[in-house]
């Protein structure tokens, strides 16, 4: 019956999760079209590959479609959704389309509140180095591939599994990874943390009887669900009880070096493994990838080479290099997608480790009013650890403002805490200039957030604001 579906239309085709699936479908030979509110690198790439992409949503866009793919960000009052429903065109959730792709391959699904994109990228890179030619769909741009998706000829499909809308429960992988479990996207789970944890259990229970759950031993919430999982479990982490663990860890010039111990009856050691990423959190991400690679029998030489040569993921501790400071000298510019206090803390710790003794300047844009409200005190705590802070207004992501959960409220709370004096930047368009006014020679500047702040480092690096 699948041959009846020839043209697939994506509503919001430029989104991180949507564009990757669209790219794989283009490469599978489907006629792909899509609409989005704005032009982006993702939409331009898809156009170059032959997809028909239009700006703006209109009922006419779906006239020739056999199926409509939507993310949870697309509302029922979208004109394309209304038109598809009137024409009885199937409306397919993004995760369901990913699940269809996964049925064609052996799926490796990476879940967890933090670290999904980096871990998925590491797994894809290791499998590629091991000549397994994987298909991958990633929530960020894998620098080595120049894309966030690729159709491979091998047996495996590596993808992120999204818990934010519980859509990961549609996937049927053969290997599932859970990096950690934290309180985020709690609206989906009725603000009930027990329900969130149960969703992860249900996700792992979707594994077949021969499947493997790769779980982080260091995360207390992941550890707490292990007894509820009736599948083979491989534990990874820094803990001595992990099956795959790291020892002799040291930071060196923005990289991490460590030994890997694999305990499975006998013990094997990989000495002096080099990971071309900073931070203990990335050591854990690498251990998860090593665990997966070991399960699918990637040679150790390929694992070691892929980790040492890993060139990163777009907006995950992405280094823009040295930028001229207006007052003379230069500053180091880094961009990161972090938007939850836990991942922000890990990234800032990684920066301290990679650049010891240097002043750390953070330009941060909070993402969603609900997250700002739910994690308010944690944001105050983590933002108080930097040496200088430029704070933007909350990126709404479609949400209505919430009283006492906006940028000004966060700025006031930080002043009361007294550890850092924030500079509030109401319009994100003014952020590049605000950074240049605050920066000194030798500083490390990190732009951080999941919203429109992603455009700021490019402007700083190209000296647009200094012209």
Swiss-Prot record:
The keyword Transmembrane does not apply. It catalyses: UDP-N-acetyl-alpha-D-muramate + L-alanine + ATP = UDP-N-acetyl-alpha-D-muramoyl-L-alanine + ADP + phosphate + H(+). Keywords: ATP-binding, Cell cycle, Cell division, Cell shape, Cell wall biogenesis/degradation, Cytoplasm, Ligase, Nucleotide-binding, Peptidoglycan synthesis. Pathway: Cell wall biogenesis; peptidoglycan biosynthesis. GO terms for cellular component: cytoplasm. Belongs to the MurCDEF family. Pfam families: Mur_ligase, Mur_ligase_C, Mur_ligase_M. Cell wall formation. It is an enzyme of class 6 (ligase). It comes from Azoarcus sp. (strain BH72). The gene is murC. One of its GO terms (molecular function) is UDP-N-acetylmuramate-L-alanine ligase activity. Gene3D superfamilies: Mur ligase, C-terminal domain (3.90.190.20), Mur-like, catalytic domain (3.40.1190.10), NAD(P)-binding Rossmann-like Domain (3.40.50.720). Its main location: cytoplasm. ATP binds at residues 112-118. Its EC number is 6.3.2.8. The keyword ATP-binding applies. It is found in: Cytoplasm. This is UDP-N-acetylmuramate--L-alanine ligase. One of its GO terms (biological process) is cell wall organization. It comes from the Bacteria.
